[in-house]
Design a protein with these regions (language model features):
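N-terminal redox-cofactor-binding region of secreted/periplasmic oxidoreductases
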Residues: 1-569
């Protein structure tokens, strides 16, 4: 079969494109997904779960060999040791990130998209993208000019009656601290706290593949979904991309197509381009890859949202009670830091009442702090070798802009006094600065040993107060207290630099931009510059990461580009 469209990656963007492009019967559409299928009626229980921790920590659903650095790399001191490599969970399953993520369904600030257009992505301002945000969703709670009512992805908020005791205490505390209550996170964009919007219906995740690749859509004879299919090479005739080579369940295959669309995410899409000789010329020559098209921006200016947490021990009455809801995040807040020219609503706090799948995780609640409008954009993706089977080298360089570090320290110092509120005092104790360290990741690995060990530790934590204090200080805490962060600038900076991690919102490595922008990889329709028949459609085309969890912006972008393609054809 000669395909009209070959989509490399069946994630959030790929699922949308597969549905929309195959809706026209004359289009033959192939989706190549390296991971497993999530067929209707047979979606793994870990994926369906409202609590996502058993999905995103499961090696079955991720690129398990992917490691990245997050700390800033010194370019002044060539002898400085490289920061430690950390695991970075990226989905390897139909539905992509939407199959394993925290199900957070938000859009960002209108100013984010006006900035996209200002940076050269013509036609991507807020007014132009809002119709596609509405098109993708059915909001189950609100029906007004901000919301969609017949899209494939349901959006809702967990009702207050189903919140954990911890969430209720935070609600009271935010109110007493004079933060404004907003019933709708996705309504008019302003500072305040709100029930977080989630892509979930009747206590089950609804991923992009579940929403867009339904049983009815899968019956289309012109749509071909090939899972367990690793694309190993892009095929070219001169500067036209004409197909892909792939391993389908281990067997070599070749597929030809009129247009190839990379939807492999902000780490793997640029890697596909560079292996094909499209990217920074010097880097390609170093690896002996013949240069097909020099594009300096491929893999450059990688972004994510820097994050740290303040955790605390939860009394039994405050924990997630799995009967009504397994959701661990009920409330969020955005506020304006007013630091370093940051726009309004630049900071985001999400309140979690469970921090891992195991028994100790159930005893720990946290404020997760995101720099939602980050200024750090010096990360990069490079190849380690020309081989398709070797993961790329990924350096996020989080906090490369000092303003991001200052805003995280400021956030910790704003939140710490809230633990003195009577509502928080009644349900939490032992607040401490926390990080998603390798130690935490190891204990979070899903296996019998961790289940047994955390079961024992949890019983001890629920024991006498002196024992709990000892265990938290010696096993859960870093080597710094909340008091020290609040009172010592040097200690605060050292902790945040070491502890800050990204929140799986990798973006911007194949940015859209104007014709005269030497760092623009794609035009405003995702078409790769100087190469015919090749597009990128995923979070890597964002000109800058929006002030949002990136799943809905990615789905929106795929909806918008799919509409453009169908209009053109």
């Amino acid at each position: 079969v000669e395909f009209d469209y070959i989509i490399v990656g069946g994630g959030s963007a790929g699922s949308v494109l597969a549905n929309r492009l195959s809706a026209r019967e004359t289009n033959q559409v192939l989706v190549c997904e390296a991971g497993e299928d999530t067929p209707p009626g047979k979606v793994p229980s870990e994926i369906l779960d409202s609590y996502p921790g058993t999905a995103y920590l499961n090696d079955r659903f991720i690129w398990s060999n992917l490691k990245v650095t997050t700390e800033v790399i010194s370019h002044n001191d060539q002898d400085a040791p490289k920061p430690p490599l950390r695991k970075y969970e990226q989905a390897r399953i139909l539905g992509g990130g939407s199959s394993i993520n925290g199900q957070m369904a938000n859009r960002g600030a209108p100013s984010d998209y006006d900035e996209w257009e200002a940076r050269g992505a013509d036609g991507w301002n807020w007014e132009s993208v809002l119709p596609y945000f509405k098109k993708l969703e059915t909001d189950l709670d609100f029906d007004d000019e901000w919301h969609g009512k017949d899209g494939p992805i349901p959006v809702r908020r967990v009702p207050e009656a189903h919140w954990s005791g911890h969430s209720r205490a935070i609600f009271e505390t935010f109110k007493r601290a004079n933060y404004k209550y907003l019933p709708d996170q996705n309504g008019f964009f302003e500072d305040g706290f709100f029930p977080v919007t989630i892509s979930n219906m009747e206590e089950q995740r609804v991923s992009a593949s579940m929403g867009y690749l339904t049983a009815a859509v899968r019956k289309r004879e012109n749509l071909h979904i090939s899972t367990h299919t690793s694309v190993t090479e892009l095929l070219f005739e001169d500067t036209r991309c004409v197909g892909v080579k792939a391993l389908v369940k281990g067997k070599p295959e070749e597929f030809r197509g009129r247009e190839i669309i990379l939807s492999s995410g902000a780490i793997h899409s640029p890697a596909h381009l560079m292996r094909a000789g499209i990217g920074p010329e010097g880097h390609l020559r170093e690896l002996g890859i013949p240069v097909r098209k020099p594009l300096a921006g491929v893999g450059q200016r990688l972004m994510d949202h820097p994050s740290v947490a303040i955790a605390s021990f939860l009394n039994p009455s405050a924990r997630v009670r799995n009967q009504e809801s397994r959701r661990h995040m009920n409330l969020g807040m955005r506020y304006s830091s007013e630091i370093g020219d940051a726009p309004a609503g630049d900071m985001f706090i999400v309140c979690t009442s469970k921090n891992s799948w195991h028994k100790v995780g159930e005893q720990i609640g946290a404020f997760l702090v995101f720099v939602n409008k980050t200024f750090s954009e010096t990360g990069e993706v490079k190849l380690n070798s020309p081989s398709w089977s070797e993961e790329p080298s990924v350096d996020f360089n989080l906090l490369s802009d000092r303003r991001d570090l200052d805003r995280i320290v400021d956030a910790i110092r704003r939140l710490a006094p809230l633990y003195a509120d009577p509502a928080m005092q009644a349900v939490t104790s032992n607040p401490f600065p926390a990080s998603y360290s390798d130690k935490v990741r190891q204990v979070g690995a899903i296996n019998t040993k961790n289940k047994l060990l955390t079961g024992i530790a949890a019983r001890l934590l629920d024991g006498p107060k002196f024992l709990r204090n000892y265990l938290i200080e010696n096993f859960l805490m870093d080597d710094i207290s909340l008091h020290e962060i609040c009172n010592d600038d040097e200690m605060a900076e050292a902790f945040v630099r070491r502890a800050a991690v990204g929140v799986w919102h990798a973006s911007c490595t194949c940015r859209m931009g104007a014709d005269n922008d030497p760092m623009a990889v794609t035009d405003n329709q995702g078409r790769v510059r100087g190469i015919a028949g090749l597009r990128v459609v995923d979070a890597s085309i964002f000109p800058v990461v929006p002030s949002a969890n990136t799943n809905f912006p990615t789905i929106m972008a795929a909806e918008k580009i799919a509409a453009t393609i169908l209009k053109r054809d």
